[in-house]
Amino acid sequence: MKFYTISSKYIEYLKEFDDKVPNSEDPTYQNPKAFIGIVLEIQGHKYLAPLTSPKKWHNNVKESSLSCFKLHENGVPENQLGLINLKFMIPIIEAEVSLLDLGNMPNTPYKRMLYKQLQFIRANSDKIASKSDTLRNLVLQGKMQGTCNFSLLEEKYRDFGKEAEDTEEGE
């Protein structure tokens, strides 16, 4: 597994249909916020599941929660590294995602945290895939709420950019 970012235009497009899609940009953010996540293949759709940095409330999240996957340093569970927010995963078009090149990032605590997150994610990729598949199924069956609307987003995401193409063809 690797880390990816996604285009702001694509995020804006999905937000037209589902306001649970996380923001990638907002004028209230003190620093630009990259939408970084991992790509999961779930029943014929590729999804980007976003990461979030560690926050105090993560301590209250149970490991069994399907809405997210807690991250910590391998072998050091006390060193919390954030979450994968599975409840906010979005179906993607590959042309709108870019590989995050960790090698070209300056050596900062943030980069070191990303490497530790990636190591933990790779070691737990089967658990992450299983949890995300279960979550999607429960949401599609109407048995879980507070997530992105996976069925609506799956219906709409492939139409991204088609309006512009249709306009160009009609000229």
UniProtKB/Swiss-Prot annotation:
Result, substituting G142A: Still confers phiA2 resistance, toxic in E.coli
EC nos: 3.1.-.-
Effect of substituting Y10A: No longer confers phiA2 resistance, not toxic in E.coli
Record annotation: effect of changing H58L: No longer confers phiM1 or phiS61 resistance, not toxic in E.coli
GO biological process, one term: negative regulation of DNA-templated transcription
Gene3D superfamilies xrefs: 3.10.129.130
Recorded consequence of changing E154A: No longer confers phiA2 resistance, not toxic in E.coli
Pfam family, one: ToxN_toxin
Resulting phenotype, F35A: No longer confers phiA2 resistance, not toxic in E.coli
Summary of the knockout phenotype: Loss of resistance to phage phiM1 and phiA2.
GO MF annotation list: identical protein binding; RNA binding; RNA endonuclease activity
Effect of mutating G37A: No longer confers phiA2 resistance, not toxic in E.coli
Keywords linked to the UniProt accession: Antiviral defense, Endonuclease, Hydrolase, Nuclease, Plasmid, RNA-binding, Toxin-antitoxin system, Transcription, Transcription regulation
Reported impact of K33A: No longer confers phiM1 or phiS61 resistance, not toxic in E.coli
Variant or mutagenesis effect after changing R122A: Still toxic in E.coli
InterPro entries per UniProt: ToxN/AbiQ_toxin, Type_III_TA_endoRNase
Phenotype when changing K20A: Still confers phiA2 resistance, toxic in E.coli
Outcome of substituting K116A: No longer confers phiA2 resistance, not toxic in E.coli
Top-level class of the enzyme under EC nomenclature: hydrolase
Effect of K87A: Still confers phiA2 resistance, toxic in E.coli but colonies are smaller
Conditions for induction: Part of the toxIN operon. The operon is repressed by ToxI and ToxN together, but not by ToxI alone (ToxN alone cannot be tested as it is toxic). About 90% of transcripts terminate after toxI, approximately 10% include toxN. Constitutively expressed in P.atrosepticum strain 1043 in the presence and absence of phage phiTE infection (at protein level).
Family classification: Belongs to the ToxN/AbiQ toxin family.
Subunit description: One ToxN monomer binds to a 36-nt-long single repeat of the ToxI RNA; this complex forms a triangular heterohexameric complex with ToxN connected by the ToxI RNA to another toxin molecule. The ToxI repeat forms a pseudoknot which occludes the toxin active site. Interaction of ToxI with ToxN partially inhibits the latter's endoribonuclease activity in vitro. The complex self-assembles in vitro with either full-length or processed single repeats; during the process the precursor is processed.
Functional summary from the UniProt entry: Toxic component of a type III toxin-antitoxin (TA) system. An endoribonuclease which is active independently of the ribosome, cleaving between the second and third A of AAA(U/G) sequences, although not all occurrences of this tetranucleotide are cleaved. Digests many mRNA species, including its own transcript and its cognate antitoxin RNA ToxI. ToxI has 5.5 nearly identical 36 nucleotide-long repeats (a single repeat neutralizes the toxin in vivo); a single repeat folds into a pseudoknot which binds the toxin.
Name the UniProt record assigns to this protein: Endoribonuclease ToxN
Species this protein is from: Pectobacterium atrosepticum
Higher taxonomy: Bacteria, Pseudomonadati, Pseudomonadota, Gammaproteobacteria, Enterobacterales
Gene: toxN
